[in-house]
UniProtKB/Swiss-Prot annotation:
Residues 30-111 form a propeptide. Metalloprotease. Residues 1-29 form the signal peptide. Gene3D superfamilies: Collagenase (Catalytic Domain) (3.40.390.10). The gene is nas-8. This is Zinc metalloproteinase nas-8. One of its GO terms (biological process) is proteolysis. Glycans are attached at residue 386. Disulfide bonds join 154-306, 176-195, 338-372, 345-365, 352-369. It is found in: Secreted. Its EC number is 3.4.24.21. Its cofactor is Zn(2+). The active site is at residue 204. Its main location: secreted.
Length: 403
């Protein structure tokens, strides 16, 4: 008897499940029919309501962030100067691109602008998510950087959707770095403390768009001289040259004004210049850009064929957090002797604008922190360093390292 009861129960459960399945099918079909007839399911999912569910540590930029970005002050620190100090010896290119450029690999030639289709973002559309670690002002810097691409190119940074397997994750990971072009899957772009300036951000984003550094062009020896005896041996790979078989300059001349050019002291082991321009007056120019050069903009538009591409809509995310604009901190410029007074500044570059360390950094690392006027900067570059590490007391050093 008990056996028959069990059998009857199983039959009842099976029939109930079957009935539920039969009911679900027409509901699913009806919902699918709700899509506009001219819209595929993929493009329909790009609408804000269908943005991919975020992890707890991820978010998007909002309209308020973009409005706050318009209100930012001129907080520029020349990107070419700060980047190589922030990422000392490792450089700011990592991920698959960095592996390919490892001198231990046989394929270690660098490229200026990728030309292989697999490394470009389809239609210039770059899906992203950002870390929720960024404060209001940092989010505004990111928004302002995105908007610069939206205004000057057809590249669009858009919130990641459910169908975007390849995307940027922008977060405070480890200094300032990016992969080059579309690497596939989750692609990290690090903008850590010390990297959240507009010019640094657009530099790293231009890597993700698909460009290497300007001083790595194959023809760079016609325009700059590399002073190998001043370069730290572990940083030699930062001065590789491009592979013409896989790259293109898009018909453009060497660009001393590029946001992608490092400065003349990059990866110096002794404080002396590591590269100088063949046109001597250009040595002070390289690495001093605070925005895209006209050639930077032209090359990006040529890479993505912007005159023909169908621009995807700009979609912003949503958040319940109230955003309050935070004014950019003021920077005091050191007028006279603008030099680093210790050779340890590269270790503490992220403390340059810290509320607690700013005065110490102005005193001992004015050059590295970007507190020089253009005239003082040119004088400092032309002079050997004057390090006096004894000026840093043990307590000051400990405070900077652990405070």
């Amino acid at each position: 008897m008990r056996r028959n009861d069990l059998l009857n129960n199983k039959i009842t459960i099976f029939l109930s499940s079957l009935s539920l399945f039969v009911i679900i099918i027409p509901i699913y079909a009806a919902e699918k029919d709700l899509l506009p007839p001219s819209t595929s399911s993929e493009t329909f999912l790009t609408d804000e309501d269908f943005l991919r569910p975020l992890n707890d540590d991820e978010t998007f930029l909002t309209e308020k962030d973009f409005k706050n970005g318009e209100k930012l002050g001129e907080d520029h620190v020349p990107a070419g100067s700060i980047l190589w100090k922030q990422v000392y010896k490792k450089g700011d290119i990592r991920g698959k691109a960095a592996w390919k450029l490892d001198p231990k690999n046989s394929e270690s030639l660098r490229r200026n602008g990728v030309i292989t289709g697999t490394r470009k973002w389809p239609n210039g559309r770059i899906p992203y998510v950002i870390s929720n670690q960024y404060n209001d002002r940092e989010r505004a810097v990111l928004a302002r950087s995105f908007q610069a691409y939206h205004d000057k190119t057809c590249v669009r940074f858009v919130p990641r959707t459910a169908v975007d397997n390849d995307y940027l994750y922008i977060g405070k990971i480890d200094g300032c770095y990016s992969d080059v072009g579309r690497a596939g899957g989750r692609q990290e772009l690090s903008l850590d403390n010390g990297c959240l300036q507009y010019d640094t951000a657009i530099h790293e984003l231009m890597h993700s768009v698909g460009f290497y550094h300007e001083h790595e062009r194959w023809d760079r020896d016609e325009h700059i001289t590399i002073l190998w005896h001043n370069i730290d041996r572990e940083a030699y790979d930062q001065f590789g040259k491009v592979d013409l078989a896989e790259s293109s300059y898009y018909g453009q001349l060497y660009d001393y004004y590029s946001i992608m050019h490092y400065d003349s002291l990059a990866f110096s082991k002794n404080g002396f210049e590591t590269m100088v321009a063949k046109q001597s007056e250009m040595t002070a120019v390289i690495g001093a850009a605070i925005d895209f050069s006209p050639i930077d903009i032209l090359k990006m538009n040529l890479m993505y064929q912007c005159s023909d591409v169908k621009l995807p809509p700009t979609v912003v995310g949503t958040t319940d957090k109230t955003i309050v604009p935070v004014p950019a901190p003021s920077v005091t410029v050191v007028e006279d002797d603008c030099r680093d007074r210790t050779n340890l500044c590269w270790r503490w570059i992220d403390r340059c604008k810290s509320f607690f360390f700013e005065q110490i950094m102005k005193e001992f690392c004015s050059l590295s922190c970007g507190y020089c006027t253009p005239k003082a900067l040119q004088t400092a570059k032309a002079s050997p360093p004057n390090y006096s590490n004894t000026l840093l007391t043990k307590s000051s050093t400990s405070y900077l390292q652990h405070g």
